[in-house]
């Protein structure tokens, strides 16, 4: 019995080319889909990291601002500075500075906040009354900041762009010529224009 010659016929060159083309197309589609998934995952992780960075920054600012204390300090020139000075930047004296190592230092700390080169930066000094060689520790808290605004709520619930209205101490006749510190604001409002998250408005209540 003679075998059918058609039963042993292999693929033609054209069929092989078509199969290779289909395989290449499927491989390209699979690779493109995988690349898209990986790219989306990377964007998601970056967004999560930026959000965690903002949350950490909020907690740091809350800890600093809500623990402000009415303690003046002296700058590197020996001039007395108010417990809280606010405008486009913010400087304050805060309490509750943890000391787990038990070092011989105060639990009070001088803190500053400023907007510099699309970053919100925190400054901290290791001493309250500084010498001329006292340098602060500079800590960038977040990037991609387009603007930072500060406002201060006074005792009459009116918002002020600066605090206090004057940097001079208030002369109180009842204290027989002694100078009285201006009151601290009731709250500090921080507005941040962020490149990725838009406008963020945070309100911190100060101890009264």
Segments (PLM) and residue ranges:
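Extracytoplasmic beta-strand-rich oligomerization domains located immediately C-terminal to a leader/signal peptide
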Residues: 29-131
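Extracellular Ig-like/FN3 beta-sandwich strand-entry sites
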Residues: 185-187
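Acidic surface patches and DE-rich sequence motifs
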Residues: 75, 154, 194
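Intrinsically disordered, low-complexity regions enriched in Pro/Ser/Thr/Gly and acidic residues
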Residues: 95-183
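Short, exposed beta-strand-loop hairpins at the edges of beta-sheets
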Residues: 189-195
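Edge beta-strands of extracellular beta-sandwich domains
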Residues: 201-205
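N-terminal single-pass transmembrane signal-anchor helix
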Residues: 2, 7-34
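Conserved acidic
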Residues: 22, 53, 137
């Amino acid at each position: 019995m003679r075998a059918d010659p058609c039963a042993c016929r292999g693929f033609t060159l054209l069929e092989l080319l078509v199969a290779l083309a289909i395989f290449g197309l499927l491989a390209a589609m699979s690779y493109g889909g995988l690349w898209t998934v990986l790219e989306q995952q990377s964007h998601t992780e970056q967004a999560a990291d930026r959000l965690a960075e903002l949350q950490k920054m909020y907690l740091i600012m809350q800890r600093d601002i809500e623990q402000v204390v009415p303690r003046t300090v002296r700058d590197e020139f020996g001039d007395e500075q108010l417990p809280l000075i606010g405008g486009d930047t913010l400087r304050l004296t805060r309490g509750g500075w943890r000391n787990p190592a038990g070092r011989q230092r105060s639990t009070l700390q001088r803190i500053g906040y400023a907007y510099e080169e699309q970053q919100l930066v925190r400054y901290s000094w290791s001493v309250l009354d500084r010498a001329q060689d006292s340098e602060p520790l500079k800590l960038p808290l977040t990037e991609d900041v387009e603007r930072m605004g500060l406002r201060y709520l006074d005792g009459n619930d009116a918002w002020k762009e600066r605090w206090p209205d004057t940097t001079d101490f208030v002369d109180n006749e009842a204290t027989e010529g002694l100078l009285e510190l201006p009151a601290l604001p009731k709250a500090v409002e921080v507005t941040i224009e962020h490149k990725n998250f838009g406008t963020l408005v945070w309100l911190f209540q100060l101890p009264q």
